[in-house]
Amino acid sequence: PEITKIVLANDKEFEIDGADFEDMVRIEGKNLGNVVSVKFNDVEVDPKEIYARYDMLLAPVPRQLPGEVTDMLYITTKNGSVSRPFTVSIPELKIDGLQNEFTNPGDTTVISGDNFDLYGITVEQADVRIGNAICTVIDATRSDITLQIPANAQPNTDLTIQGGEMAEPVAIPYMNTGHQIFDFNDWPGSGGFTHSSQFPDNTLNFLCDGTEGDGYPEPLNEGMKYLRFHGNVGAWGWMVLWAGYIQVPADVAADPAAYNLCFEVCTNASYPLNSTTRIALGNFMWMPGASGIPVNTYGGWRTMRIGLDEVSENTILPDGCSPAPDNTE
């Protein structure tokens, strides 16, 4: 057999020397019929997925991590073998974190990401712990792990994930309070204020603890308060739940790229966060519905994360800014 050209099956014009998992590759040459095996690195293609004739062969790149990376393509037919340098891109494991970092012990939550299946993060193989407390893995897909937080899980402890194809576990935070910049139990706090109440169609106080009645979600933890918007804003009106300045710790200001701004959101399934909702941090604007897809937590608390390197072009003042002027007098 002989290989003269390799292209993607859906783009026969441009020759390639590598591909991604699940790409369909077209191999052109001579004596390519009567195929015995096709391998990318040491991963063999399922024979049922190969189409071959004398001058052409079609084969998908298997979605499987190689045991040995050789950066070679191997073809064996009944008439002999041929190989050619060919690089398959290995996708990295992506772990976004817990959907709710403050899930209470005994409750169920989800870890989101991608390529969990490739790295052996499955119901059978995954070892998920909070400290030494073992989490029960209920379900696992390519992009989600559903698990139960153990009853003896402790706050401010790393959650570790070890898959069957991982050399080392990955750690993500669980109930890590970090550097707290807002305390809704002391709302609006030093340097903060709300000016929404000047509009007659706005609620005067948005601070809740979950005991107000139907429709009010339970707080993340017992005794914790939260802000809730429930109502309508009239034409040319707006609802500012909080505004002011914050004190940023010096170590955060020195290396913003190492930190995320995290907060929890809970939406009614019928009222997701669309493009009319926003959080402003200096010149940075977080608009959850900017992509056209609103954020909907379907009645549960979800952790939102904004990389601080996205805020104010990676520049944060450790002492905050000047307090807003008092124009009420």
Language model: regions and residue ranges:
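Extracellular Ig-like/FN3 beta-sandwich strand-entry sites
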Residues: 66-70, 106, 154-156, 256-258, ...
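Beta-rich carbohydrate-recognition modules and glycan-binding surfaces
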Residues: 173-329
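A short beta-turn/strand-edge loop motif at beta-sheet boundaries
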Residues: 31-36, 67, 116-122, 153, ...
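Aromatic sugar-binding surface patches on proteins
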Residues: 50-61, 139-146, 300-313
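Short, aromatic- and glycine-rich surface loops/edge beta-strands on solvent-exposed regions
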Residues: 67-79, 155-165
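Short, surface-exposed loop/turn segments at beta-strand-coil junctions that are enriched for proline
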Residues: 61-67, 148-155, 311-314
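Beta-strand/beta-sandwich contexts
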Residues: 1-34, 79-123, 166-190
